[in-house]
Amino acid sequence: MDYIKKAIWGPDPKEQQRRIRSVLRKNGRNIEKSLRELTVLQNKTQQLIKKSAKKNDVRTVRLYAKELYQINKQYDRMYTSRAQLDSVRMKIDEAIRMNTLSNQMADSAGLMREVNSLVRLPQLRNTMIELEKELMKSGIISEMVDDTMESVGDVGEEMDEAVDEEVNKIVEQYTNEKFKNVDQVPTVELAANEEEQEIPDEKVDEEADRMVNEMRERLRALQN
């Protein structure tokens, strides 16, 4: 019976509203989960940088700094997406409250742009496509955008020099923090201690590479 009603009269508006809100909540949970996981990665990477800085291992500090830069960039992207999702939610709620939907919704083009921007994020792609379908059924948007994946691969693509500059800032931050009181430290005693605790370069490099690969895998998992 419900199937016949839907075939004749179209989807029930209240049911569509529930579905839309459910998809919005799902997207919100996905973003919050990604932000929490990225925060854990940030903290872990910062600790690794500090540990390497204490050993005066600038090479490893720079290696971890590059990873921290990528993590920070992804975090900023997700944080911005959370604000965009809130904007989408408010516009949809306003349309539902006023019961105007597509016929009188003046900002549907702006809404489509924001939805399309969120679809470009791999973390939200599936659920945002689901939202687009529900919005089409409700008439809030007239069509799905075809070029949703056009810039997924190059979002935030930057010049190497700009990346190096940001990485250098991170390196300077932690190395300056390490050596800001260097005048107060007896140079001879420091050298003696370092000789006693010296670790083979091969082991340091292997450990650094292992940690970097682990962080990259976790970041890749978050992105996909």
From Swiss-Prot:
It is a peripheral membrane protein. One of its GO terms (biological process) is ATP export. It is found in: Endosome membrane; Endomembrane system. It comes from the Eukaryota. Pfam families: Snf7. GO terms for molecular function: identical protein binding. Core component of the ESCRT-III complex (endosomal sorting required for transport complex III). ESCRT-III appears to be sequentially assembled as a flat lattice on the endosome membrane and forms a transient 450 kDa complex that contains DID4, oligomerized SNF7, VPS20 and VPS24. SNF7 oligomerization into a membrane-associated filament is nucleated by association of SNF7 with VPS20; the process is terminated through association of VPS24, possibly by capping the SNF7 filament. VPS24 subsequently associates with DID4/VPS2. Interacts with the VPS4. Interacts with DID2. This is Vacuolar protein-sorting-associated protein 24.
